[in-house]
């Protein structure tokens, strides 16, 4: 990963998303434990095993963060370890830069394994909500279901 990108101040410099099928939940949990043991400076993110939720991530996954801004210097070590130990899972490693979510999850991202179809439209909805737009689908305000 390009470590010279303009990273966002005050945010984790990079995220790791490990995607898994529902029947591989235990195997994914084992990978997460190994990842945390090997890189104890990573921060634990969310565990989302509910596919179909309104999210840019189309399938179950767990997330880890490079917590400290200095951790960006170590991201390529994590990527190399994951290449050897990913256990067949599709993994997305992306920076959090001033370029925004769409570019961070596409142009600047590193995929290990088969890429999954990121739902980029969700980022656009999230941006609309941030700037105060209220979008409705049927009788539901988008703000209430994200």
What are these regions (language model features)?
Residues 1-26:
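N-terminal, charge-rich interaction modules
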Residues 13-15, 61, 88:
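Broad gene-expression machinery/nucleic-acid interaction feature
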Residues 18, 62-66, 93:
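Short beta-strand element of the conserved SAM-dependent methyltransferase core
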Residues 23, 27, 31, 70-74:
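Short amphipathic alpha-helical segments
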Residues 26-43:
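Short amphipathic alpha-helix segments
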Residues 39-84:
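Short, intrinsically disordered low-complexity segments
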Residues 68-146:
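Charged interaction segments
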């Amino acid at each position: 990963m390009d470590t010279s990108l303009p990273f966002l101040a005050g945010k984790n410099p990079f995220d790791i998303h490990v995607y898994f099928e529902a029947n591989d939940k235990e195997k994914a949990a084992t990978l997460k434990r190994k990842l945390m043991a090997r890189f104890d400076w990573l921060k634990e993110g969310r565990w989302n095993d509910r596919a179909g939720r309104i999210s840019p991530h189309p399938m179950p996954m767990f997330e880890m963060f490079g917590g400290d801004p200095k951790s960006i210097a170590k991201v390529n070590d994590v990527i190399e370890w994951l290449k050897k130990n990913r256990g067949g899972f599709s993994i997305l490693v992306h920076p959090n830069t001033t370029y925004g979510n769409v570019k961070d999850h596409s142009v600047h991202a590193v995929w290990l394994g088969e890429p999954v179809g990121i739902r980029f439209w969700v980022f656009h909805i999230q941006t609309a909500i941030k700037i105060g737009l209220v979008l409705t689908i049927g009788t539901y305000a988008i703000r209430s279901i994200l």
